[in-house]
Amino acid sequence: MIRATSVTAKFDRAFDTITLDETARHRRRMMMRSDNGIEFLLDLPEARLLNHGDGLLLEDGRVIEVRALPEPLYEVRGRDSRHLLALAWQIGNRHLPAEIAEDRILIRRDHVIRDMLEGLGAMVTDITAPFSPEGGAYQAHSHDGHSHHQGHTHDHHD
């Protein structure tokens, strides 16, 4: 069984593609099948979100490009930027995955949340789009046996 052991953003041409929703794109180790039927084992050192456009590097050097499957979502808009920030706070307070842009927030469909947001004056529209929610504050990646939270950097000295 061929394995994909790393993710790359730099590749000239993909051998194949794999189209996955957001939940299926957050993996470490799993049997997968490409869009054209190639079976492979995703075998990464740690769990991570595979982003649209990432390449899964197979052991033989071929690359399978990740595509984000459009999902049923809500597009949430506020009256102005202050209102959108307040809506983002409400969404975050409920620990909901959210993709945040300057003028809108995307969340998974949930009629209870929709009712709440509309009750707060939000404009909520049903859409179908790829979903790439923000990483959490405690989501970290590791280097050389220790970890850094996103946004934290420093030099390493021997």
UniProtKB/Swiss-Prot annotation:
Residues 133-158 are annotated as: Disordered. One of its GO terms (cellular component) is cytoplasm. CDD domains: UreE. Pfam families: UreE_C, UreE_N. GO terms for molecular function: nickel cation binding; unfolded protein binding. It is found in: Cytoplasm. Residues 141-158 have a biased composition (Basic and acidic residues). Keywords: Chaperone, Cytoplasm, Nickel, Nickel insertion. One of its GO terms (biological process) is urea metabolic process. InterPro entries: UreE (IPR012406), UreE_C_dom (IPR007864), UreE_N (IPR004029), UreE_N_sf (IPR036118). Involved in urease metallocenter assembly. Binds nickel. Probably functions as a nickel donor during metallocenter assembly. Belongs to the UreE family. This is Urease accessory protein UreE. The gene is ureE.
